[in-house]
Amino acid sequence: MKNRQLIQAVDVHAAGEPGRVLIGSGLRVKGATMAEKLRYCEEHLDDFRNLILHEPRGYPGLCSPIVVPATDPSCDFGMIVMEQGGFKPMSGSNLICTVTALIETGSVDVSEPVTELRVDTAAGIVTVRAEVEAGRAKSVTFGNVPEIGRASCRERV
């Protein structure tokens, strides 16, 4: 039987939360911005999301970030998150999984003892700092995008 699509995935975890990072999905995710890429995934790739996350390949607790080209030239890569309930613009644990996988597979330029990256997400640009030793990510921290939920809620009251 011929393979119709080859997918490169790395299974990692962030504090025990599993992530299957797709570093070579072969997907052509269209969009001029990360928000457009997210919308494209929602409209065209839900069957693919189910293929990766549901049995027999996946399981209920699994999430899967997709590494895509960044739309902002200042960023090192882009990320879209597939969760059981759909596609999400950003997830901290999935970001940690993605950065760990990319560092440990040599998919991004690594500087020891600290690697700094900029990640393009549909929620905005996220800055990441990874402590690296012997090619392994020892810790990953990030400065997330601003929260808008509280301000929006206050304005409604």
Regions from the PLM with identified roles:
Residues 1-146:
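A glycine-rich beta-to-alpha transition motif near the start of alpha/beta enzyme domains, typified by
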Residues 147-157:
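Residue-level detector of conserved catalytic or cofactor/ligand-binding positions
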